[in-house]
Amino acid sequence: MKPQVYHVDAFTSQPFRGNSAGVVFPADNLSEAQMQLIARELGHSETAFLLHSDDSDVRIRYFTPTVEVPICGHATVAAHYVRAKVLGLGNCTIWQTSLAGKHRVTIEKHNDDYRISLEQGTPGFEPPLEGETRAAIINALHLTEDDILPGLPIQVATTGHSKVMIPLKPEVDIDALSPDLNALTAISKKIGCNGFFPFQIRPGKNETDGRMFSPAIGIVEDPVTGNANGPMGAWLVHHNVLPHDGNVLRVKGHQGRALGRDGMIEVTVTIRDNQPEKVTISGTAVILFHAEWAIEL
């Protein structure tokens, strides 16, 4: 069977919104070099290749147009959405393996559609970025210290992939941000973190609006980012920013509006001793089209 190639918009139920990904299923007969060529040809920020696995339900490899990466949140949602549709799955929990390890994925079926949930890695936090580094980040975003939520740090947070959390006051016009990309690239090299995630909390709601800039790895702005919204949820618990019941915090993370690709990620943080213990990101997707690879590979 020739590989089937799918164009999927993830973290949205509306076509041409959310974050697009390529999905190739099945991909067992493809070499690594062929996967890289296909990812380059499709041109998505990430393309997911679904493979047989001996120690889990499915193995996924992720490629940008230039390099293989360990895992990708929106491409994972896209991949499992396609797999569930093709196989006609019902409600189930499965395990996937990737270069990032083994992860639990929950698939929920609602009215012939699917909601995909991915359990991310263990939350972690680096020391706050202070002094010249903090000032450089604020300047690179063309903000001032007065735009930052008072009493909270600019800090690298991770649930497997580190991102810089930059909490903004709600009155800041986040859609108007136009960062100095060269400056952000230089800061990335200095701190060893490629993603900058300014975000703000919607007043009176457990909802946020964010944007994600990663110029150091060739992504000027990512539309909707699982590997940013997940750590953000953990960061919000770590600093006790939003109210919760001591067991779970649920946050809706909105992103992509400034690009005309608005989407939403549901972030669920399991809490122990007032600290984040586990983070799960959830979302749906929409398949725009799929095709069979026409040439012999």
UniProtKB/Swiss-Prot annotation:
InterPro entries: Phenazine_PhzF-like. Gene3D superfamilies: Diaminopimelate Epimerase, Chain A, domain 1 (3.10.310.10). GO terms for biological process: biosynthetic process. The active site is at E46. Its EC number is 5.1.-.-. Belongs to the PhzF family. Homodimer and homotetramer. This is Uncharacterized isomerase YddE. The lineage of its organism: Bacteria, Pseudomonadati, Pseudomonadota, Gammaproteobacteria, Enterobacterales. The gene is yddE.
